[in-house]
């Protein structure tokens, strides 16, 4: 195996150099060829970090000493135990750098807007994007605000020391290969770098731009179409995360909620035409897309083809989901399960740690570059997270005038735009000036012929989400958990909670902006009338604790019931995973079957709930028109008729249904978008509200279609306004079916028995740095974007990036798995050692028997700390 990997690595390096030559990459971007290929110091002379095993030592820092025991195990975990807390975090920093330095360094450089300093001018738009998000300023403010006597500061301080101790020890043999290719030696790590990774993650989890295309919809489409296509609350029945009864009738037929007015365009600045405004919106959309494209088309991306993990971080529009739930067994035991759906790479975006110190024994997964454990459990509590997906990004159009250059009209007076003067160092060029313009309600992202669009995001204010997880790591009860949760403000999550005392709950606390006018789903007038007036008070924020159903769940569906008194957003996942989880939990709870086995059954479930809504109407339509079907179409009908809705790799019906559902959705809505001149520049085909690639599992259109198909099959929206054809649901379903069979015959051949799902639907673990030869897979895969065991798209590198199940009555029995491995070094046996378990639906016992006794501290009565 080692020889094969050396061959792959050699081919990868050769490919890098050939691509560089063929693309005429500027020589200043790369290290000199002789240095890269030098047998003594180049890529050939690289050694992997240590493999599996345990060792003990005494660590001395600043005249303080601590006993340390470290175990690296083949289940994807690094285990650290010490008699001093500071030593645990120092060692975590050192070992994270040893196994993941390039990964964490590139994430931090990117988010600080410094990637051009290593890569060159091709990624300058990406750096400008993150400078526009004010990342350098925000991270500095966070560091300046830290309480230097706090537990969280101590953890961050010693973690940073540990990272830098490793960087200082770097030799040519241990230098990451990507650094050698680029001729780069890392600078010392800073606390700001850690918070930059925090900002990267919070933007990925909360950044959105749906308001931009929705504004175009409001301007181009009449009110009755907006009302039908984009209801303020989902048109189909959903199980909200927090089904609490509040004030009745909030989302009423007028769309009013707390003074808001949905479905009508917001006021425009004086003298601005609709067309000028639309062109400015299109420019704002292009701002995001250009930042994303700049990275994908950069030198790094060309040298390392296929790099995509950063793509979602840049544009912030990725809609990967997640699942979590908590449930009580008949004896009152609290179970927790969690599987966040993020990019699946090698190395993983996660790194597994068990951290043991005075009063602490926590195990779970962490983001490289951040101290502590992000998701996991300790002997007292367990927690997991899904993205709550509320709206925390708002857009405004400023009132400007040629008579007041450099100013905007706000709250009755003209005010100057604040200018933040940036200098971005670009490799091979030097310093490039870049100005960021700020108004009272956000940063300028587009200025088209005097039409100025600004964005306000809660993440542009200094908050310390990392403190949340450090306090979770040491929490021993609900009160201490809520203390940690109080620090989590941006990138709001549905935090699932279970403890050894039988408490269960889900909490979505954070900064929810309140506005008092207009339609916040669209760009609003920036004259001060529609600004944030505060945030939803904590006591009214969504949560559920010890529900009478004995379970609670979240899967990125709508947060609240329609009578919740505050606006929290409107573009969520479509709720089908949540519906399936609710169905299964209800069954298992009624059976008294809340066990590890039943929780695994739910996590690995591949039933697409949309088949409960669409399959029978399709079969009814086909059965009444069998005489019009071709022999192959009849064969496809028979396969669908006998199908259970499970997306297994060997299912042919799954393939037919998947393509049919896409065509049915497209055939219903695309004529209307064409009729009202919705264009790609407006976001057509990119955003879920305009038939983007996630539209069958995210956003309102698929819910509209389910509602109309089952309840209003003759509704006017099935008509084709372009041709004038009068249609109903049956006609469109048959049209989509005919298109699907023709498409599959063209793609897969004339024999439907060979159209099995695993033939066209695969999982791949892409190399984090995009070296295709070092990716893992692809593998035929079950599931789709609507199944609990999710695999988005046809070549999926998004899905359950971490699976956790724990019974808090016996937390030592907790199980989990993530794909990939500890090491980013491709020749290491720890590069890909957990993938087979993950692919096969298997789990590791997180704290297995046979470890040194220190790792059972706080679990077993006789276990002690080292020293």
Stretches with model-predicted labels:
Residues 27, 34, 291, 567-634, ...:
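Terminal end segments
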Residues 8-14, 19-334, 340:
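Substrate-recognition/specificity elements adjacent to catalytic centers across diverse enzyme folds
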Residues 357, 362-367, 376-380, 385-529:
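Glycine- and hydrophobic-rich flexible loops that cap the catalytic core of alpha/beta enzyme folds
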Residues 125, 136-138, 160-161, 459-496, ...:
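Proteins synthesized as precursors that undergo proteolytic processing into mature forms
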Residues 78, 82, 86-126, 130-131, ...:
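Gly/Pro-rich active-site capping loops and adjacent beta-alpha segments
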Residues 488-588, 646, 661-665, 671:
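Hydrophobic alpha-helical segments
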Residues 659-751:
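Charged, long alpha-helical assembly modules
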């Amino acid at each position: 195996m080692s020889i094969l990997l050396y061959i792959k690595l050699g081919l990868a390096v050769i490919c890098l150099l050939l691509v560089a030559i063929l693309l005429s990459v500027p020589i200043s971007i790369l290290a000199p060829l002789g240095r890269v290929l030098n047998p003594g110091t180049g890529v050939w002379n690289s050694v992997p970090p240590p493999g599996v095993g345990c060792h003990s030592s005494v660590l001395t820092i600043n005249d303080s000493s601590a006993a340390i025991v470290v175990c690296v195990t083949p289940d994807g975990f690094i285990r650290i135990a010490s008699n001093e807390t500071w030593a645990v975090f120092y060692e975590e920093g050192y070992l994270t750098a040893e196994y993941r330095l390039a990964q964490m360094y590139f994430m931090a450089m990117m988010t600080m807007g410094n990637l051009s300093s290593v890569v060159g001018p091709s990624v300058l738009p990406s750096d400008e994007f993150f400078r526009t998000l004010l990342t350098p300023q925000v991270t500095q403010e966070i560091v300046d605000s830290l309480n230097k006597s706090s537990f969280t500061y101590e953890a961050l301080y010693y973690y940073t020391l540990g990272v830098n101790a490793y960087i200082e020890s770097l030799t040519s043999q241990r230098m990451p290969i990507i650094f050698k290719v680029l001729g780069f030696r890392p600078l010392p790590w800073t606390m700001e770098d850690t918070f930059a990774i925090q900002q990267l993650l919070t933007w990925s989890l909360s950044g959105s731009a749906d308001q931009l295309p929705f504004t175009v919809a409001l301007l181009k489409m009449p009110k009755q179409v907006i009302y039908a296509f984009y209801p303020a609350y989902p048109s189909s029945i959903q199980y909200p995360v927090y089904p609490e009864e509040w004030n009745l009738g909030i989302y009423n037929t007028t769309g009013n909620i707390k003074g808001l007015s949905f479905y009508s365009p917001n006021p425009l600045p004086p003298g601005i035409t609709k067309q000028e405004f639309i062109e400015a919106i299109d420019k704002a959309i292009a701002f995001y897309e250009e930042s994303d494209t700049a990275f994908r088309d950069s030198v790094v991306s060309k040298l390392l083809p296929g790099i995509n993990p950063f793509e979602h971080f840049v544009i912030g529009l990725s809609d990967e989901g997640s699942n979590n739930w908590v449930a009580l067994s008949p004896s009152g035991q609290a179970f927790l399960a969690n599987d966040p759906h993020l990019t699946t790479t090698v190395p993983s975006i996660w790194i597994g740690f068990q951290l043991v110190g005075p009063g602490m024994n926590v195990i779970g997964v962490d983001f490289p570059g951040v101290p502590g454990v992000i998701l996991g459990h300790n002997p007292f509590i367990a927690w997991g997270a899904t993205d709550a997906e509320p709206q925390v990004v708002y857009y405004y159009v400023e009132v400007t005038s040629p008579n007041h250059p450099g100013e905007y009209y706000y709250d009755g007076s003209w005010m100057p735009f604040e200018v933040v003067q940036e200098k971005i160092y670009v490799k091979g060029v030097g310093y490039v000036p870049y100005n960021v313009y700020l108004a009272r309600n956000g940063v300028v992202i587009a200025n088209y012929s005097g039409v100025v669009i600004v964005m306000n995001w809660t993440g542009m204010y200094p908050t310390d989400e990392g403190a949340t997880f450090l306090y979770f790591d040491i929490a021993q009860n609900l009160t201490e958990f809520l203390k940690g949760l109080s620090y989590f403000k941006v990138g709001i999550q549905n935090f699932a909670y279970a403890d050894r005392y039988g408490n269960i709950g889900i909490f979505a606390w954070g900064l929810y902006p309140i506005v008092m006018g207009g339609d916040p789903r669209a760009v609003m007038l920036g004259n001060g009338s529609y600004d944030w007036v505060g945030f939803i008070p904590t006591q009214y924020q969504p949560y559920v604790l010890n529900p009478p159903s004995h379970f609670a769940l979240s899967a990125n569906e709508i947060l609240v019931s329609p009578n919740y008194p505050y606006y929290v957003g409107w573009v969520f996942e479509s709720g089908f995973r949540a519906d399936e989880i609710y169905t299964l939990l209800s069954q298992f709870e009624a059976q008294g079957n809340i066990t590890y086995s039943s929780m695994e059954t739910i996590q690995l479930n591949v039933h697409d709930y949309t088949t409960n809504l669409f399959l029978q109407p399709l079969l009814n339509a086909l059965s009444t028109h069998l005489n019009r079907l071709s022999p192959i179409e009849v064969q496809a009908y028979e396969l669908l008729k006998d199908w259970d809705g499970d997306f297994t790799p060997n299912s042919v019906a799954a393939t037919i249904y998947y393509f049919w559902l896409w065509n049915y959705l497209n055939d219903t809505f695309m004529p209307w978008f064409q009729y009202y001149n919705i264009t790609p520049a407006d976001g057509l085909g990119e955003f879920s509200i305009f038939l983007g690639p996630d539209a069958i599992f995210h956003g309102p259109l698929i819910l509209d279609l389910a509602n109309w198909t089952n309840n209003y099959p003759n509704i006017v929206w099935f008509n084709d306004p372009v041709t004038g054809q009068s249609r109903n649901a049956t006609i469109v379903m048959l049209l989509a079916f005919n298109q699907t069979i023709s498409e599959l015959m063209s793609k897969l051949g004339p024999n439907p028995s060979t159209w099995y799902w695993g033939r066209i639907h695969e999982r791949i673990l892409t190399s984090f740095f995009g070296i295709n030869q070092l990716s893992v897979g692809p593998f035929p895969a079950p599931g789709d974007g609507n199944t609990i065991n999710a695999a988005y798209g046809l070549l999926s590198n998004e899905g359950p990036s971490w699976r956790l199940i724990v019974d808090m009555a016996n937390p030592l029995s907790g199980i989990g798995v993530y794909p990939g491995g500890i090491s980013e070094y491709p020749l290491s046996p720890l590069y890909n050692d957990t993938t087979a378990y993950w692919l096969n639906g298997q789990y590791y016992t997180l704290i297995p028997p046979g470890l040194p006794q220190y790792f059972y501290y706080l679990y077993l009565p006789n276990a002690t700390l080292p020293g």
